Amino acid sequence: MAKPAKRVAVTGAAGQIAYSLLFRIANGDLLGKDQPVILQLLDLPQAQGAVKGVVMELDDCAFPLLSGVVITDDPKVAFKDADVALLVGARPRSKGMERKDLLSANAEIFTVQGKALNEVASRDVKVLVVGNPANTNAYIAMKSAPDLPKKNFTAMLRLDHNRALSQLAAKSGKPVASIEKLAVWGNHSPTMYPDFRVATAEGQDLTKLINDEEWNRNTFIPTVGKRGAAIIEARGLSSAASAANAAIDHVRDWVLGTNGKWVTMGIPSDGSYGIPEDIIYGVPVTCENGEYKRVEGLEIDAFSREKMDGTLQELLEERDGVQHLLG
């Protein structure tokens, strides 16, 4: 018996990240190889032609799991009964634009989208914000959707997590899949803190395998933090395929579970680890039965505290910068 189709809404559907994302969703990479999907694609009125072109390509792939496609410029149509919402579209920073202008431009977008989700999405909708500043955009959407559970709103730190995994695998000479118990704390920005103090590779303690605190502080942390900028420098374009891949990883794990493995998600803080409530902050989690659960009881040393508080400070400033726009 075929499963009923799940509705997956994707914003910024004409953009580069979406172009790397939509074909994989239609192929079953997001929700499983036995789960039909209906794609509900949102973009601006002037982008509708480009979205239609992408949908022509989706049609031409003849994906067995793709049960239907909706193209719209209306958030209430895009989010209608959505089971998953991938908020990819955001206002990019243009030349000479102040950060506060970027925050307020995005506050407008994510307030509208949060309200639409609140009105029409499934009450169990899983929302992932990819568009930057992702944590604060997720916070704005969450605040604009008071009737939905706060836990439904998450921000993407999986790209930072995957970038950190790759750097650790290269440094330790161990396969990337063997690395466990990595955490990334805080904001999806250069201030986030990748933390491998308790991580293992093939069951061995990674800090002993690498044994280089100077590398950790002066190479590893800045490399992960500035990787996006390095890709723009090299490619002339921002990381789109790796961001799409991280979005797939994030939602697939949330829906289908991590089998006890740690992953990183930006989630509403509950006050643990000295991070105040009412903020979306990256923490290590495990997922099962469609729910995430933060990893508890980790020791926080002085260096980690400093890094975690630094990224928290940035998040609090961003939150304060949009508070007046939230009514």
From Swiss-Prot:
Q: Which reaction does it catalyse?
A: (S)-malate + NAD(+) = oxaloacetate + NADH + H(+)
| Residues that coordinate or bind substrate | 93, 99, 132, 163
GO MF terms here are: L-malate dehydrogenase (NAD+) activity
Q: Name one Pfam family in it.
A: Ldh_1_N
Active site per UniProt: 188 (proton acceptor)
* Residues the record lists as binding NAD(+): 12-18, 106, 113, 130-132
User: Which biological process annotations from GO are given for this protein?
Assistant: malate metabolic process; tricarboxylic acid cycle
EC numbers listed for it are 1.1.1.37
Q: Which Gene3D superfamilies match?
A: Lactate dehydrogenase/glycoside hydrolase, family 4, C-terminal (3.90.110.10), NAD(P)-binding Rossmann-like Domain (3.40.50.720)
This protein's superkingdom? Bacteria
Keywords assigned by UniProt?
NAD, Oxidoreductase, Tricarboxylic acid cycle
Member of which family?
Answer: Belongs to the LDH/MDH superfamily. MDH type 2 family.
Against NCBIfam families, the record matches this protein to: MalateDH-SF1 (TIGR01759), PRK05442.1 (NF003916)
Function noted in UniProt: Catalyzes the reversible oxidation of malate to oxaloacetate.
Q: What's the protein name? A: Malate dehydrogenase
The gene behind this protein is: mdh
